[in-house]
Amino acid sequence: MTHQIAVLPGDGIGPEIVEQAERVLKALDLPLELRQAPVGGAAFDQFEHPLPPATLELAQGSHAVLFGAVGDWKYDTLPREFRPEQAILGLRKALGLFANLRPAILYPELASASSLKPEIVSGLDILIIRELTGDIYFGTPRGVRTAADGAFAGEREGYDTMRYAESEVRRIARIGFESARKRNKKLCSVDKANVLETSQFWRDLVIEVSRDYLDVELSHMYVDNAAMQLVRNPRQFDVIVTGNLFGDILSDEAAMLTGSIGMLPSASLNAAGQGLYEPSHGSAPDIAGQGIANPLATILSAAMLLRYSLNLAPQADRVEAAVRKVLADGLRTADIHEAGTTKVSTSQMGDAVLKALG
């Protein structure tokens, strides 16, 4: 069976880093069909829309999507619906992607690059699972209005709606428990149940789901404490499951513990296992075309693609082992370079990973 992969390089450094991930996938000699399409600003330049119908059709008809990055300052004056960033939102909605998986791993060779002391962060290996379709980002009603009553009657006010449906919480909780079961069997559910009705509802449902996973140790933590604990003692965590808003913030915080966001992959999955895989960093237009971008997050995203959407765990293991070997050999792109290591370009890093694959 041939697996079709939609390859959407995007803007900025996107094409450079995706090229290296494509090389790695092709080197594995698997039955893959990689098909490219424009997205983001690159698509707007050609079709006056960040997510053209042909690109969306390709993504919907593929087993998985390998995504680079979108965005550039030159598009900031466009109406919101035409900005490059709308492409990723459109893909999430069209593909029904509801679970975002963000690993935060500190490789031993990069311990000195972390913002925390090595004795605190050494051995860090966290998986943060963020719900993508609900919460305050998508709740309605929302907008700006004139307050009709209360202490601020007559003033303009902005308002949003935080909401979660029961089915949304149950399905993301199951992803959390299943992921923890495959790791160290520890799941921490993060909420704000002491203040928010939505969070108390979330917590109650996670507890209900936990009865199907008695082999997994479940704990709960308020989001403010979780943010503190990620800095104070990050190794206490194995898998974290949380809502859209809290996950957006905590996953970026965890990213900075690893030394460089250029090392962090991510996966967004739907109920059928179809996924969109992308590096956690942005399009970095300021360094685009210079050949200095770090492709490892994208290569590791390709490994996640193999693992989660194609069920090819052995091949994913090979790619991840190759990345570890390259780091152990002292090769570094500019973002993680330090004294005593060898600085390499984007393509040279890709060459090194291919060599390590054997």
Swiss-Prot record:
Enumerate the residues binding substrate: R92, R102, R130, D224
- One GO BP: L-leucine biosynthetic process
So what does this thing catalyse?
Answer: (2R,3S)-3-isopropylmalate + NAD(+) = 4-methyl-2-oxopentanoate + CO2 + NADH
Matching entries from InterPro entries are given as: IsoCit/isopropylmalate_DH_CS (IPR019818), IsoPropMal-DH-like_dom (IPR024084), Isopropylmalate_DH (IPR004429)
| Keyword Transport among record annotations | no
* Site, Important for catalysis: residue positions: Y137, K192
Which residues hold Mg(2+)?
Answer: D224, D248, D252
Gene Ontology cellular component terms for the protein in this record? cytosol
Q: Which PROSITE patterns did the record assign? A: IDH_IMDH
Q: Where found?
A: Cytoplasm
* Self-association and partners: Homodimer.
- What this chain does, per the record? Catalyzes the oxidation of 3-carboxy-2-hydroxy-4-methylpentanoate (3-isopropylmalate) to 3-carboxy-4-methyl-2-oxopentanoate. The product decarboxylates to 4-methyl-2 oxopentanoate.
This chain's protein is named 3-isopropylmalate dehydrogenase
| Species in which this protein is naturally found | Bordetella pertussis (strain Tohama I / ATCC BAA-589 / NCTC 13251)
Taxonomic placement: Bacteria, Pseudomonadati, Pseudomonadota, Betaproteobacteria, Burkholderiales
